Amino acid sequence: MSDHINPKYPDIPYLRAKAKKRIPGFAFDYLDGGCNAEINLDRNTREIREVQLKPYYLRDYQDISMETVLFGKKYSAPFGISPIGLQGMIWPGASEILAKAAFEENIPFILSTVGTASIEKIAEITEGSAWFQLYHPVEDSLRDDLLKRTAEAGIELLVILADVPSFGYRSKEIRSGLAIPP
């Protein structure tokens, strides 16, 4: 077995099953669900399973590196922790835990506009290396405040969410009684 794989966490389906047992139902539905009939969620899952990595045999493997440069900064891997709203609902201190792990492993961490940790706290944990995802609020003054706080905290990368003009219909959340304020 590879020494890079933690046998306690062998794969994503295993982690999902563990999370379903451990996280309250309404929070798991939020984390695991998608909008409308979950068509895009299903499509994304199917398409990622169709990705095939091409192996290169009989080559020197001593200097293998996944390092990459994104926006002028070198990271240990070409992926990071994407923004998840209401992380603290899923697990206490989740935003802080994930930000710390991302910082220690030198991968990007993106704080959601509706994250449960403050911009300032995440900037402190990541020494300003976090990214901030802006989900444009209805009120311009709120947007301006978020952007000001982000800049003052030393966060230099902004991810602007421009996929939908409003929150999607999430039937799992409706069934579980979860309601998110506007």
What kind of region is each of these model predictions?
Residues 94-132:
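A glycine-rich phosphate/pyrophosphate-binding beta-strand-loop-alpha-helix module
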Residues 1-72, 170, 177-182:
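An N-cap/entry alpha-helix motif that binds or orients negatively charged groups
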Residues 79-82, 109-111, 130-134, 158:
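Hydrophobic faces of well-ordered beta-strands that scaffold small-molecule active sites
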Residues 24, 81, 102, 160:
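Conserved, mostly hydrophobic/aromatic
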Residues 83-92, 132-140:
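Active-site mouth loops of central-metabolism enzymes
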Residues 36-39, 89-94:
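A structural motif shared across PLP-dependent enzymes of the aminotransferase-like
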Residues 86, 100, 121, 125, ...:
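Alpha/beta enzyme core
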Residues 67, 74-87:
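Metal-dependent C-N hydrolase catalytic cores
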